[in-house]
From Swiss-Prot:
The protein's name: 4-hydroxybutyrate dehydrogenase
Documented EC number(s): 1.1.1.61
Chain residues that bind Fe cation: 193, 197, 261, 280
Coiled-coil annotated residue ranges, if any: none
Record function comment: Involved in the degradation of 4-hydroxybutyrate. Catalyzes the interconversion of gamma-hydroxybutyrate (GHB) and succinic semialdehyde (SSA).
InterPro entries, A to Z: ADH_Fe/GldA (IPR001670), ADH_Fe_C (IPR056798), ADH_Fe_CS (IPR018211), Alcohol_dehydrogenase_Fe (IPR039697)
Binding locations of NAD(+): 37, 67, 94-98, 138-142, 159, 280
Organism the protein comes from: Cupriavidus necator
Entry similarity comment: Belongs to the iron-containing alcohol dehydrogenase family.
Record's keyword terms, sorted: Iron, Metal-binding, NAD, Nucleotide-binding, Oxidoreductase
Gene3D superfamilies: 3.40.50.1970, Dehydroquinate synthase-like - alpha domain
């Protein structure tokens, strides 16, 4: 059986942010570095977290980019050490939480960040010295608040994963109230990320019934509420269910992901118009139909009737084309439906394919993908 580890403290409810101080005290954090971004600060959400930690010595790092980078990890880790911090509180989307995980490594371990990347054999080098982290998500997508991994763009342009149980947040404070002001476009993109996690981890071939059950329930919640949350950001029930779907997708994906993510990781590391950082959730939505078509005849998918089980969770008719349903949902949400719309060109394929073949998600796809397979998926996603 696959290794199963669900030991994060999770608080999921409206008003949960008020528990921040008591959670810090439980964990032993007295001087937290609050890791966030300018948008969360401007929305007043960061201040709500600071107010909830009244009496603690809170330092603030608010320069998280749209995709976390090694350079920003270095800068924040230096602030962590200079301020004498003893823990981290990440308030934001997956970028802030992943950046905080990078800080948790670099502020407490020697050497360059790249030596701790999963594909460099770095997981074993991450020890229990890693700084303790509390995660407060303000989007519903990555589920990084309950995950042991982080995705960070390195100085050399590679977008790599860092995985260790020592990076698992000590507490996930999931307050849907913090997502009520999230713009429609970001609600849709992050929501499709959560849906991708639930679908892809369910299709991963490892034997892990608890993960499968969590993923299917998360998919039903996400698929059933993403349009409502996008249409009406103040819909509290939809926001609660999307936050749960996000959390559940990440709880389950310890089972493994697949080609959606092995493609979206290198795609997210591309420089488009001189800038790095295509949105991860949007990329997942765009490439997912091609990957679903590729995986349809995978042995474990056929043996376990997994597409029929996905249809039931998504409330689709028997025999419905799941790939087309995902594409149609992306259209209804107003997201880009092709990589070309996002600035990707065919001359970038070789770099993306090279990254996909060594990505940590490549090995857990239900069907082995070759370079030619990845090229076809990219062509179909343009």
């Amino acid at each position: 059986m696959a290794f199963i580890y669900y030991l994060t403290h999770i608080h999921l409810d409206f008003g949960a942010v008020s528990l921040l101080k008591s959670e810090c005290e439980r964990i032993g954090i007295r001087r937290p570095l609050l890791v966030t971004d300018k948008g969360v600060v401007a929305a007043g959400v960061a201040q709500r977290a600071i107010d909830a930690m009244q009496g603690l010595q809170v330092a603030v790092f608010d320069e998280t980019p749209s995709n976390p980078t090694e350079a920003m990890v270095r800068k924040a880790a230096a602030q962590y050490r200079e301020a004498g911090c003893d823990g981290l509180v990440a308030v934001g989307g997956g970028s802030s939480i992943d950046l905080a995980k990078g800080i948790a490594i670099l502020a407490t371990h020697e050497g360059e960040l790249t030596t701790y990347a999963t594909i460099e054999g770095g997981s074993a080098r991450i020890t229990d010295k890693a700084a303790p982290l509390i995660a407060v998500p303000t989007t519903s997508g990555t589920g990084s608040e309950v995950a042991r991994g982080a995705i960070i763009i390195l100085d050399d342009g590679r977008k790599l994963g860092f995985h260790s149980w020592h990076l698992l947040p000590k507490s996930a404070v999931c307050d849907p109230e913090l997502t009520l002001g999230l713009p429609a476009g970001l609600t849709a993109a992050t929501g499709m990320d959560a849906i991708a996690h639930c679908i892809e981890t369910f299709l991963a071939p490892a034997f892990n019934p608890p993960a499968d059950g969590i993923a299917l329930d998360g998919l039903e919640r996400g698929w059933g509420h993403i349009e409502r949350a996008t249409r009406d950001g103040q819909d509290r029930d939809a926001r609660l269910n999307m936050m749960s779907a996000s959390m559940q997708g990440a709880m389950a994906f310890q089972k493994g992901l697949g080609c959606v993510h092995s493609l979206s990781h290198p795609l997210g590391g591309l420089k488009i118009d001189g800038r790095t950082g295509l949105h991860h959730g949007t990329l997942n939505a765009v490439v997912m139909p091609a990957v679903l078509r590729f995986n349809a005849d995978a042995p474990t998918v056929v043996r376990d009737d997994r597409y029929a089980r996905l249809r039931r969770a998504m409330h689709l008719p028997d025999g419905a084309d799941i790939a087309q349903a995902v594409h149609d949902m992306t259209v209804r949400l107003g997201l880009p439906t092709g990589l070309r719309q996002m600035g990707v060109t065919e001359d970038m394929f070789d770099k993306v394919i090279a990254g996909a073949l060594v990505d940590h998600c490549h090995k857990t796809n239900p069907k082995e993908a070759s370079a030619a397979d990845y090229r076809r998926m990219l062509e179909q996603s343009m």
